[in-house]
């Protein structure tokens, strides 16, 4: 992706996948916008195929425990854990995005809606995921700073 100039977009994809707990991202699950005349790749396609995000198979409130059994059984397909992947992909832009997403709440729809308990549980999971990513990033940043200071 770096050769195509899409490194930032790929990083953003993995960070967003972590926040929404997308269990179905894999090497064949993203796309490109291609110029039909030249067949040149112009950009990454907007993110799509999130039907395995937001814990779709969790049926009971107990399954929404952060890092619990559901997470072990329905984790990411790339890597073992969303958090380290997201931390490795953080940039100033994605870090700011996560900070701005703190406190996110779903907008309820009058006709198409999930039960209130589920929406609240999903909001909590997303908040916990954001906090875990940012906390791990803070630890990682401190470790890097300490290592650099040790060399001086």
Positions of predicted regions on the chain:
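Anionic ligand-binding catalytic core segments
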Residues: 1-22, 26-27, 31-152
């Amino acid at each position: 992706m770096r050769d195509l100039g899409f490194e930032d977009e790929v990083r953003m994809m993995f960070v967003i996948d972590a926040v929404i707990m997308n269990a179905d991202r894999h090497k064949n699950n993203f796309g490109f916008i291609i110029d039909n005349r030249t067949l040149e790749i112009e950009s990454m396609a907007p993110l799509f195929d999130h039907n395995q995000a937001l814990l779709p198979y969790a049926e009971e409130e107990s399954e929404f425990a952060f890092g619990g059994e559901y997470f072990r059984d329905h984790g990411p397909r790339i890597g073992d854990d969303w958090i380290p992947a997201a931390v490795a992909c953080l940039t100033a832009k994605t870090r700011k995005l996560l900070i701005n997403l703190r406190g996110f709440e779903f907008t309820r729809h009058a006709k198409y809606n999930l039960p209130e308990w589920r929406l609240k549980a999903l909001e909590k999971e997303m908040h916990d995921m954001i906090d875990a990513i940012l906390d791990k990033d803070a630890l990682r940043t401190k470790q890097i700073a300490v290592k650099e200071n040790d060399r001086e």
